[in-house]
């Protein structure tokens, strides 16, 4: 997996993106929030709002399966019919996830060391969205080298324990302070976990 930096983005960067149909090129909604399944470490879809400054929440949601392409400037879908009413599975996930938002969750290593709190989720937008890391802050251990927030790569499977997200202690050697170098850090970290190589 060779990750080009332009394929990585923070989940919060998607908020406000227009949802555009390929059918007519019409912007039919805006992303209100990103629905992230912390247990699966995956992007499930989006809640939506009407376009414009005063656009309120929409009753429909957009499941990831309906997204044709996700870019830095828009979310592309085939047609307006791809939006689902809130009584479907994604809507249920949205409802259930309100009490377990990953933002502000504590990140611990499997050795019991506190790394900080999640401030954002990093998504690889290649063939399909994959959550590959967290941006964290509030770390006395990691942030002195960057003065603020750092990027922590995630393993291919993630342990979630109540309020905390658990990552392998080996993550220390793969933390970066810039998004541009983060893709390579994710690759090296996952390779290290698979093979034990440094």
Task: Give the ranges of each region predicted by the language model.
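Peripheral interaction segments used for macromolecular assembly
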Residues: 1-198
